[in-house]
Design a protein with these regions (language model features):
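Bacterial N-terminal signal peptides that target proteins for export
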Residues: 1-8
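Short, linear, compositionally biased motifs with a strong N-terminal bias
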Residues: 13-14
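Short, charged juxtamembrane terminal tails flanking transmembrane helices
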Residues: 180-184
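Residue-level recognition of oxygen-bearing side chains
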Residues: 6, 70, 162
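A short, hydrophobic C-terminal helix/tail in secreted or cell-surface proteins
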Residues: 158-177
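Extracellular, disulfide-bonded carbohydrate-recognition/adhesion ectodomains
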Residues: 21-156
Length: 184
């Protein structure tokens, strides 16, 4: 009987871990992969946590949402409000992407909730996407204890570039080997 209880406990633990760290999902609209991480973190911690993840050789970053289709896709991934990579911490009122290929770019597409962004109490510099797909400015510096999950985006190296990098690496290896053989 105790072996059955141990097995059930192990399976329950695996289930909890798997739900918090799901396999990233591919979105054909961007060619990227996305992952909702339900770990409860501060807005400023979410960026570092996303960068600590990788998938298919690509380093993660907080999701950048460039159109309504991508917004809908991400909305369907999340089960609670989640941090995305949009911030005006650098320049108040200038909402720009903090990571990924769009880092530093001003947001051209937004889906703010009515009355947002409002910089409530002069301190909402980060963006959460809600389960209805609308966005809210929130987080640090004013709300120092506001925590929730985040959406990680992965931009894998395109296949042709991967093959080119492999070819360059093989050529370099061949050159070094040839140079080494001629010395001996």
């Amino acid at each position: 009987m105790s072996n059955i209880k141990k097995a059930i406990a192990i399976l329950a633990g695996i289930s909890v871990y798997a739900s918090a760290h799901a396999v990233p999902v591919f979105y054909s609209g961007t060619g990227n992969y996305y992952e909702y991480v339900s770990d409860s973190v501060l807005s400023t911690e979410a960026q570092a946590a996303a960068a600590a993840n990788s998938y298919l050789g690509a380093t993660g970053y907080l999701a950048t949402i460039l159109d309504a289709g991508e917004n809908t896709f991400i909305t369907n991934l999340i089960s609670n409000a989640a941090w995305i990579g949009l911030s005006d911490a650098t320049t108040e009122g200038q909402w720009q992407w903090v990571d990924g290929p769009e880092a530093g770019d001003l947001a051209m597409y937004t889906n703010w909730s009515a009355g947002e962004p409002n910089d409530f109490a002069s301190g909402e510099d980060y963006t959460e996407i809600r389960t209805n797909g609308t966005w809210n400015d929130h987080g640090i510096p004013h709300f120092t204890n506001y925590r929730h999950g985040y959406v990680v985006e992965y931009s894998p190296v395109p296949a042709p570039a991967t093959l080119a990098l492999l070819g360059i690496g093989m050529a370099g290896f061949g050159f070094i080997r040839k140079k080494h053989l001629t010395k001996n």
